[in-house]
């Protein structure tokens, strides 16, 4: 007796799901005003996570560590010690 061994293969492969294709929106962090630039009170100077740059003279720190100007004036980025940076706002001389 003759035995036949028939095997049928899938004409379409199973479709797997991709592991790519998603990304979070950017948070737009970073320095918003440059050294020597004129700013008004309330202007955002730096958006950051944690205190990478510390508040100096006439600069406040928000709940999300955003640095903002308290008075109208000129922005000045400064080094404090070896490894600390701060931003200050000095009133413009009339």
Swiss-Prot record:
A cellular-component GO term for this protein: cytosolic large ribosomal subunit
InterPro entries in the cross-refs: Ribosomal_bL27, Ribosomal_bL27_CS
Keyword Ribonucleoprotein found: yes
GO molecular function: structural constituent of ribosome
Keyword S-adenosyl-L-methionine tagged: no
Disulfide bond positions: none
Record keywords, A-Z: Ribonucleoprotein, Ribosomal protein
One Pfam family, short name: Ribosomal_L27
Gene Ontology terms: biological process: translation
PTM: The N-terminus is cleaved by ribosomal processing cysteine protease Prp.
Positions annotated as propeptide: 1-9
Domain of life assignment: Bacteria
Annotated NCBIfam families: L27 (TIGR00062)
Family: Belongs to the bacterial ribosomal protein bL27 family.
HAMAP family the record matches: Ribosomal_bL27
Protein name (record): Large ribosomal subunit protein bL27
Gene, per the UniProt record: rpmA
């Amino acid at each position: 007796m003759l035995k036949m061994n028939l095997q049928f293969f899938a004409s379409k492969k199973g479709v797997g799901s991709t592991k790519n294709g998603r990304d979070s929106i950017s948070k737009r962090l970073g320095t918003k005003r440059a050294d020597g630039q004129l700013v008004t009170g309330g202007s955002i100077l730096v958006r950051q996570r944690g205190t990478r740059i510390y508040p100096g003279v006439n600069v406040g720190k928000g709940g999300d560590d955003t640095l903002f100007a308290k008075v109208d004036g000129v922005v000045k980025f400064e080094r404090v010690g070896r490894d600390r940076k701060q931003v200050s706002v000095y009133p413009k001389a009339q």
